[in-house]
C-alpha cells in the first residue's frame, strides 16, 4: 500500500472474534484464537505501521497521523460468559491509552472506538445458548450498522491537528 500511495496516514485496527461461554469447562483453543486475533493481530499490525505513521506525521499536508483501534463496550463493562472476550477488549483499551501517551507528542493521534451492538457477523461464531442470547439481543434492539462505525472513525481522523479523540463510544440508542 505504501508503495502504491506513497505514505500511510491512518491505521484502523478492526479485526475481532467473539466466542462466548462460561470459563468453567471452556475450550482453551477458542481463547487462543480470540487472543491471537483481538490482541496479537492488533499489536503486530500497529508495530508494522507505526514507523510509517510517525514519518507521515512529520510531513505535509496533514502533519498528523491517526491510529483508531476498534474495541467494544465489552472493553469497559464485563458480563458473565464474556470473560475472555472482555479480557481482549479491556486489553485493547489499555494498550491504546499507553500507546497514545507514547506517541502523542510526535503528532500521532491514537484513539479507541468502543461500539455497542453492530450488525456484523461477530455473533455468528457462537452456538447453542450463547447464539440464542445474541439473537435475542439483536431482535430486541435496533442495533448499529457498519456505516455508524465508519462515521465515528471518520469523525476521529478528520479533526484539526490540535484535537485528538482519545475515546469514542458509539451505542445503539436503546442499548442499556
Task: Tell me the role of every PLM-derived stretch.
Residues 46, 88:
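Active-site helix of classical SDR
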Residues 112-113, 120, 131-176:
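C-terminal helical subdomain
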Residues 22-23, 30-32:
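Substrate-binding pocket helix/loop in short-chain dehydrogenase/reductase
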Residues 72:
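Residue(s) in the substrate-gating loop at a strand-loop-helix junction
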Residues 24, 77-83, 141:
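Active-site loop immediately N-terminal to the catalytic Tyr-X3-Lys motif
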Residues 51, 101-104:
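Alpha-helical segment proximal to the catalytic Tyr-Lys
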Residues 1-6:
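Conserved amphipathic alpha-helix within the SDR
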Amino acid at each position: 500500500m505504501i508503495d502504491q500511495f506513497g505514505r500511510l496516514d491512518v491505521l484502523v485496527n478492526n479485526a475481532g472474534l467473539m466466542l462466548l461461554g462460561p470459563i468453567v469447562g471452556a475450550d482453551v483453543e477458542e481463547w487462543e484464537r480470540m487472543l491471537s486475533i483481538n490482541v496479537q493481530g492488533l499489536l503486530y499490525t500497529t508495530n508494522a505501521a507505526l514507523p510509517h505513521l510517525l514519518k507521515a506525521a512529520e510531513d505535509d499536508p496533514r502533519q498528523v497521523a491517526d491510529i483508531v483501534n476498534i474495541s467494544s463496550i465489552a472493553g469497559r463493562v464485563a458480563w458473565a460468559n464474556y470473560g475472555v472476550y472482555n479480557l481482549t477488549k479491556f486489553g485493547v483499551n489499555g494498550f491504546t491509552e499507553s500507546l497514545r501517551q507514547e506517541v502523542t507528542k510526535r503528532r500521532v493521534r491514537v484513539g479507541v472506538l468502543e461500539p455497542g451492538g453492530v450488525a456484523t457477523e461477530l455473533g455468528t461464531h457462537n452456538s447453542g445458548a450463547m447464539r440464542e442470547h445474541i439473537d435475542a439481543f439483536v431482535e430486541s434492539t435496533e442495533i448499529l450498522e457498519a456505516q455508524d462505525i465508519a462515521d465515528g472513525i471518520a469523525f476521529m481522523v478528520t479533526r484539526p491537528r490540535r484535537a485528538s479523540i482519545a475515546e469514542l463510544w458509539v451505542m445503539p440508542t436503546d442499548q442499556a
